[in-house]
C-alpha cells in the first residue's frame, strides 16, 4: 500500500471554484479528452465544490482521414475541430465552454488558466506552450502561471501522459516535473518531426491504432479525476503499450524539485 506521504495533494485554493482549463488540440487525443472533461465536470459538481470551464484551441479542420479514429462524422467535414466538438459538448451537457479556431499560445491567454492540457503532435508545439508558461512571471508582469501542465502523446500503438507543475507555489512546497523536464530532448530544435497528415481512413489506421487515443485519454482523465475529485494522486502519469498490454506508471519525485532560476 502506498504511503500517504508519497502523494501529491491538490492545493486548497482549488476549492469552491470553476477550474479554468486550456485544452490545446482537438484531434485524436484532444477530442477524447474534451468528451471526458465534460463527464469529469458532471462528476465534480456532484461530489465536490469544484467545476470546470474549458477553452479548446485548434486551428485544424475535419478531414476524411479523421473519420473513424476521431469522434467526427461525414457532416463535420471541412468544419473547425475545436468549434464542432465544443458546440456538441455544450449542447449535450448544457455548458458554455469556449472554442478558439487558432493556435496556442498566439491566440489564447495561457496565463489566465489553472490547468493546461496539451494534445499536440510536435515538439515545436510543446516548446511554444512551455515558453508561454515560462513567460508568466507574477513578480514582474502580474501573470500567474498555470498550476498544472498535463501532456498527452502517442505513436502507433503506445503513448504516455504526464502531469507537472510549471512553477512552485506558496502552499505547495514541492512540484512535479513537466514534460519538458522528463524529456529534455524536446527542447532540441534540430530533431526531425513526422507530422505529415494522413490522406485516408485506411492510412490513418495504418499509422496509429484505432483506440490508442481513447486509451491514453482515459488514463489521463482517471488521473485528473483522482486529483480534482479525490484531492490527490499517487503517480504523475504512465507509459502505455497497447501491443503488449503493459502500463508503466511514472512515480512521483521522492524529493521536491527545485524551480530553475
Predicted features, each with a name:
Residues 2-29, 33, 112, 122-126, ...:
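Glycine-rich phosphate/adenylate-binding loop
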Residues 17-47, 55-63:
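Glycine-rich adenosine-cofactor-binding loop
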Residues 37-45, 71, 133-137, 228:
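Active-site catalytic pocket residues across diverse enzymes, especially alpha/beta-hydrolases
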Residues 48-49, 57, 120, 153:
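N-terminal Rossmann-like NAD(P) cofactor-binding subdomain of oxidoreductases
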Residues 50-94:
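Glycine-rich phosphate-binding loop and adjoining beta1-alpha1-beta2 segment
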Residues 53, 96-98, 148:
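Conserved beta-strand segments of alpha/beta enzyme cores
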Residues 100-107:
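Conserved SAM/SAH-binding loop
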Amino acid at each position: 500500500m502506498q504511503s500517504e506521504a508519497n502523494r501529491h495533494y491538490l492545493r486548497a485554493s482549488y476549492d469552491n471554484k470553476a477550474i479554468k482549463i486550456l485544452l490545446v488540440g482537438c484531434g485524436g487525443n484532444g477530442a477524447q479528452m474534451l468528451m471526458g472533461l465534460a463527464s469529469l465536470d458532471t462528476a465534480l459538481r456532484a461530489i465536490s465544490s469544484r467545476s470546470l470551464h474549458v477553452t479548446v484551441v485548434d486551428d485544424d479542420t475535419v478531414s476524411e482521414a479523421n473519420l473513424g479514429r476521431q469522434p467526427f462524422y461525414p457532416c463535420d467535414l471541412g468544419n473547425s475541430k475545436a468549434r464542432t466538438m465544443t458546440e456538441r459538448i455544450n449542447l449535450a451537457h448544457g455548458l458554455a465552454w469556449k472554442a478558439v479556431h487558432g493556435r496556442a499560445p498566439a491566440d489564447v491567454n495561457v496565463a489566465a488558466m489553472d490547468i493546461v492540457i496539451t494534445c499536440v503532435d510536435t515538439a515545436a508545439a510543446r516548446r511554444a506552450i512551455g515558453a508561454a508558461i515560462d513567460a508568466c512571471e507574477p513578480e514582474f508582469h502580474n501573470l500567474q502561471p498555470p498550476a498544472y501542465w498535463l501532456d498527452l502523446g502517442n505513436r502507433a500503438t503506445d503513448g504516455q501522459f504526464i502531469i507537472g507543475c510549471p512553477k512552485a507555489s506558496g502552499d505547495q512546497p514541492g512540484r512535479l516535473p513537466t514534460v519538458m523536464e522528463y524529456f529534455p530532448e524536446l527542447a532540441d530544435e534540430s530533431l526531425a518531426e513526422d507530422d505529415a497528415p494522413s490522406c485516408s481512413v485506411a492510412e490513418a489506421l495504418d499509422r496509429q491504432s484505432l483506440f490508442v487515443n481513447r486509451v491514453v485519454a482515459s488514463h489521463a482523465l482517471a488521473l485528473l479525476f483522482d486529483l480534482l475529485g479525490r484531492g490527490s494522486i499517487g503517480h504523475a502519469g504512465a507509459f502505455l503499450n497497447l501491443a503488449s498490454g503493459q502500463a508503466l506508471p511514472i512515480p512521483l519525485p521522492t524529493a521536491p524539485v527545485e524551480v530553475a532560476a
